[in-house]
Amino acid sequence: MKAAGIDIGTTTISGVVLEKEENGQAKILEAKTVENGCFIETGNEWERIQYAKEIVERAVNLLDYFLEKYPHVERIGLTGQMHGIVYVDKEGNCVSPLYTWQDARGSIYAGDQIPLTEEIRERCQIHAASGYGLVTHIYNIRHNLVPDSALSFCTIMDYFGMYLTGRKKPLVHVSNAAGFGFFDSHKMCFEKEKLAEMGVDTNWLPDVCTEIEKLGTYRGRTVTTAIGDNQASFLGAAGDEENILLVNMGTGGQISVLSGQYFSGDGIEARRFGIYDLCR
C-alpha cells in the first residue's frame, strides 16, 4: 500500500510517498520540498500573514506531481504549521490570509492597555501565546478584521483538506485544535465559558475529532484529517516508542517525549497524540 503525505510549513512545503513493505516498515519512494514563499508584506512590524490560496495552490501542485508519478497511492495524509488560522465561509471557501503562528498582534502594547495575551492570562487564567489562533481571532473581532462572509476558522492544512475533498465545514484533529489556545487537553474540549467571556461566539469553533478520520476523497484517494506538525514529526521519527527524546529544529524548535499520562508545568506543553506528546 502506498500513501502520500503533505507538510505545509512556514517556509517550505514538503511531500513524501511511502510504501508499506511486507515486514510492516515504511519505505520512502520519494521526498520533495518546494519553497512556501507566500508571506505578505504589510506596514505592521508585528504582522506575519501569508497568501493562503497561493499556499494551497503550491501544495496541490506538489500532491498532483506525486499522484501522476505514483498512481497506486491510496491515502493522503496532511500536516503543517500549527496555531495559525484562516477564515472560511459557509461554502468552505477561504476568505482571508493565513494568520501564522509568528503573528504578534496579541502582544501589542496600545497606550495604557496591556497586551491581549496578558489580559487573557489575568481574566481567564490561561496561557495563550500571540500567534495562537484564538488570540488572533479575539484581536480581529475587536478591531473589525474578521471577514464579513466568514463563519469559522481552521489551520492551513485543515483548509487544504477541505479544498481537496470539497468539505464545507472544518474538521480539526485535537492536535491542531489544542494549538488554537483555550483548549483543555485533559478533557479534550474548548473552554467555551472563557471564550464567551472574551467575546467569542463559540458557534464559530470548528468540529474536533480525537482520532484521525476520513475527510473525503481526492482523485479517488482517501484524504484524512491533518495532524499537528509536532505530532507528525514524532510519529515519523519515533513512532509510538516511549523513552525516546525527539529534537525537532524547523522554523521553530521543540524537544518532545511520549508520555502515558497528562502532565503540565512551566515551559512544558502536553499535546494530545493518542496518548500525550510532552513538548518543551
Name these PLM-found stretches.
Residues I8-T10, R121-N230:
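Gly/Ser/Thr-rich active-site cleft segment
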Residues I85-K90, C94-G111, A150, C154-F190, ...:
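Glycine-rich phosphate-binding loop of actin/hexokinase-like ATP-binding domains
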Residues I76, D103, N140:
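Residue-level signal for inorganic ion chemistry
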Residues M1-S96, E122, S149, P206-D207, ...:
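N-terminal glycine/serine-rich phosphate-binding loop of ATP-dependent small-molecule kinases
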